[in-house]
């Protein structure tokens, strides 16, 4: 029966097919002939640009269907709940590689053209449309088999197969780990990994999206910890995911983890740090609350039951509840169905040989103490440790009311007590002044574990930003980190000092905070030096790069001189910089350089054959200070030299580089809005661009200007990001008004009488 009409509902992204008579009830086959577009929007079926070793520009054809873009490639019911098997055939030039989800079962000449072949793939398991993938391009590969017999390949640009070996080794290790952990085997005969040159990002599932994404974000860390215990990966998780999620979730313009979605354009909106990072953080807290053994048992029950069916969040809670006997649904609903998280205030009293703790919870708000009538409540799994054994929980309790008292048996008066062991609970802690004072020696002598030192410092910084404590208190605590050896702790400290520096760039004492940065980072800089020492690990190399970059940016004299010397040798080919030192050296010479320095950097960018090196250069270009050079960098950002998705980090780098850069980047975005918006078509990159460009402002009127601009230039998929940015600008302005003078006085006082370590 031939269809008689196609009615397109563009707004809802649907098409209605009309037939001449009523179709019979039952199973049928719908055959649709269609012509699609190989687009350049980094979504659906699109072309991805790459350069051959000889400098020729070519294109690969690749797919990115998550969340709602399979419909751009072929007509389908593009909803995660509607599943099917897929038989895929690709007709491709015979010198190109064709890949899809399944293994190739036939490859034969195409009848009409001897330069083309038809590649047929095996039928997929039952799955959602967003999981379908295909790639056509020029690639080399390396391959191995995992110990359970799955063929693993890593595809690389031609001539770069060597660079795929580490990824191959890791992939082959992870498959058996997941199989053992979940007691569910990998369901396909092969797995291909491929890095795509132009790629926006992977994302998933609607209302229950967070479960998919949050879980994936958490389990990847669990797997890395299993394969590479020396990476100290959970400390990195706290810095990269946990604190980032808390920062967003403290805003009035946050959203619960579980969000119902009405329209496809809203899907990109909920793929933010809440879905991924808060999702992962609450699953980490849940795993800790249940214990690994029962968690694995519950996961296996859940996965076995819902292997090819749709599952909702509640189904997972039920399986975990059955496995652990704990009230999982009641606890987790307080974390997934309401936005935000609690601030736990704690004070202590010694009662003979015991320590009495008084705990109370209120919602933590970035704007200061919660003042609403009905304060939301959480069921909070709380772990408490003491200096007797800083790595073990002395006590675990479930705080299921606004206030509670807890007694710790046999705690001597000279022992410190800390909440949130391992920074696992998704809450912030405010200690009474005596409790905080007692924890400082634990930072200095490193008896507090790294992840707890990081969590303590981050909580204090957030409390200061929210106006609950003074920023000066945090600066004093930061000075206690003088003996800190841990990369991730320094990384978080550095990030917070960067936020403070950006804030104080609105004042006339910006140089004083740079002196503070130099004082904090100089001792570790001297200990590390410029060159690797025998026995150093991967994290020491990262720390060296971080510290030298911080000192160089702040204008530390000897660091600047050495960076210039090494840069000159690098450019002249006398002594090539190691990968770990390139970013800090490039950043330092650009920040304190001139037009010639920028020209050399742009030349290095053009000559680089590794995308990693190009990205490294793009990220530091914004450090340049003169207005005309900043303009040159912004123009470069939109040029053919920069891949579309990397334009965002160049413009963001300019905005984050200096006071002038911030204004210039915002003007540039307004002037080039149409081109930028068309380029990213409402995907998540537009949200990222807006966030990076305006989040550093700290003047009330800028919030109004940003809001007004986007009212007249709507970006529907970035609506929530815009609201969050405006809120952050107002919060920055309030923070500056509140604390600028006391910070200035403290920095002057330090200058007059330098602290002794």
Range-by-range predicted roles:
Residues 47-66, 198:
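Short edge-strand/loop segments of extracellular domains
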Residues 82, 372-380:
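Short coil-to-beta strand junction motifs in C2/discoidin
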Residues 63-70, 75-203, 218, 254-255, ...:
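Hydrophobic helix-coil surface modules that form long, contiguous segments used
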Residues 242, 353-354, 358, 372, ...:
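Long, ordered, helix-rich scaffold segments
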Residues 18-19, 158-165, 269-270, 443-447, ...:
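Second-shell loop/turn segments in exported
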Residues 1-52, 75, 113, 404-412:
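A surface-exposed beta-strand-loop module
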Residues 1-4, 377-379, 383-387:
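Solvent-exposed beta-hairpin/edge-strand motifs
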Residues 1, 11-13, 60-62, 121, ...:
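Hydrophobic alpha-helical and helix-loop surface patches within well-folded domains
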């Amino acid at each position: 029966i031939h269809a008689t009409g196609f009615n397109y509902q563009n707004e809802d992204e649907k098409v209605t097919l009309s037939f001449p008579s009523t179709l019979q009830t039952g199973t049928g086959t719908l055959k649709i002939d269609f012509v699609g577009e190989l687009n350049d929007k980094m979504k659906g079926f699109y072309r991805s640009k790459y350069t051959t070793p000889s400098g020729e520009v070519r294109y690969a054809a690749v797919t990115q269907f998550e969340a709602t873009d399979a419909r751009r490639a072929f007509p389908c019911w593009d909803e995660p709940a509607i599943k099917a098997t897929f038989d895929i055939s690709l007709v491709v030039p015979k010198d190109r590689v064709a890949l899809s989800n399944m293994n190739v079962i036939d490859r034969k000449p195409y009848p009409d053209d001897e330069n083309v072949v038809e590649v047929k793939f095996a039928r997929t398991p039952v799955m959602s449309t967003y999981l379908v993938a295909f790639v056509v391009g020029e690639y080399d590969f390396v391959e191995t088999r995992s110990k359970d017999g799955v063929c693993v390949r890593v595809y690389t640009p031609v001539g770069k197969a060597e660079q795929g070996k580490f990824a191959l080794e890791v992939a082959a290790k992870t498959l058996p780990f997941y199989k053992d952990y979940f007691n569910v085997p990998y369901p396909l005969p092969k797995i291909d990994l491929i890095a795509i040159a132009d790629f926006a990002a992977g994302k998933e599932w609607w209302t229950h999206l967070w479960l998919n994404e949050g879980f994936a974000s958490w389990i990847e860390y669990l797997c890395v910890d299993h394969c590479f215990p020396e990476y100290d990966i959970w400390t990195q998780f706290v810095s990269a995911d946990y604190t980032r999620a808390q920062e967003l979730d403290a805003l009035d313009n946050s959203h619960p983890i579980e969000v119902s979605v009405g329209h496809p354009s809203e899907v990109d909106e909920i793929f933010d740090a809440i879905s991924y990072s808060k999702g992962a953080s609450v699953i980490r807290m849940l795993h800790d609350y249940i214990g690994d053994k029962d968690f694995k048992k519950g996961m296996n029950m859940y996965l076995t039951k819902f292997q090819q069916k749709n599952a909702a969040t509640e189904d997972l809670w039920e399986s975990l509840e059955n496995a652990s006997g704990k009230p999982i649904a009641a606890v987790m609903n307080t974390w997934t169905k309401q936005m935000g998280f609690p601030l736990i205030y704690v004070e202590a009293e010694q009662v003979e040989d015991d320590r009495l703790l008084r705990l109370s919870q209120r919602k933590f708000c970035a704007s200061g103490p919660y003042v609403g009538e009905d304060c939301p409540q959480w069921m909070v799994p709380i772990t408490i440790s003491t200096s007797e054994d800083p790595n073990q929980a002395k006590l675990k309790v479930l705080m299921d009311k606004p206030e509670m008292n807890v007694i710790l048996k046999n705690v001597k008066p000279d022992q410190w007590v800390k909440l949130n062991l391992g920074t696992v609970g998704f809450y912030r802690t405010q200690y009474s002044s005596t409790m905080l004072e007692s924890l400082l020696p634990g930072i200095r002598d490193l008896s507090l574990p790294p992840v707890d030192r990081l969590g303590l410092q981050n909580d204090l910084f957030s409390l200061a930003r929210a106006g609950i404590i003074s920023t000066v208190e945090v600066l004093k605590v930061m000075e206690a980190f003088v003996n800190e050896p841990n990369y991730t702790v320094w990384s978080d400290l550095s990030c917070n000092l960067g936020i403070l520096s950006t804030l104080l760039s609105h004042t006339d004492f910006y140089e004083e905070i740079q002196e503070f940065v130099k004082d904090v980072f100089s001792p570790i800089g001297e200990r590390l030096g410029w060159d690797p020492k025998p026995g150093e690990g991967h994290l020491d190399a990262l720390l060296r790069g971080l510290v030298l970059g911080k000192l160089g940016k702040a204008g530390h004299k000897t660091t600047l001189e050495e960076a210039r010397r090494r840069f000159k040798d690098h450019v002249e080919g006398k002594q090539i910089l190691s990968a770990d030192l390139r970013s800090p050296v490039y950043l330092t010479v650009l920040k304190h350089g001139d037009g010639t320095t920028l020209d050399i950097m742009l030349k290095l960018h053009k000559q680089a054959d590794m995308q990693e090196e190009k990205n490294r250069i793009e990220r530091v270009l914004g450090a340049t200070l003169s207005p005309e050079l900043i303009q040159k960098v912004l123009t470069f950002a939109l040029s053919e030299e920069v891949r579309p998705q990397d334009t965002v980090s160049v413009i963001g780098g300019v905005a984050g580089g200096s006071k002038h850069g911030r204004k210039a980047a915002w003007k540039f975005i307004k002037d080039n809005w149409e081109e930028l918006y068309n380029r990213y078509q409402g995907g998540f990159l537009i949200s990222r661009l807006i966030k990076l460009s305006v989040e550093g402002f700290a003047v009330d009127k800028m919030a109004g200007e940003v809001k007004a601009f986007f009212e007249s230039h709507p970006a529907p998929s970035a609506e929530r990001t815009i609201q969050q940015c405006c809120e952050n600008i107002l919060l920055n302005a309030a923070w500056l008004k509140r604390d600028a003078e006391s910070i200035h006085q403290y920095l002057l006082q330090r200058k007059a009488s330098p602290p002794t370590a």
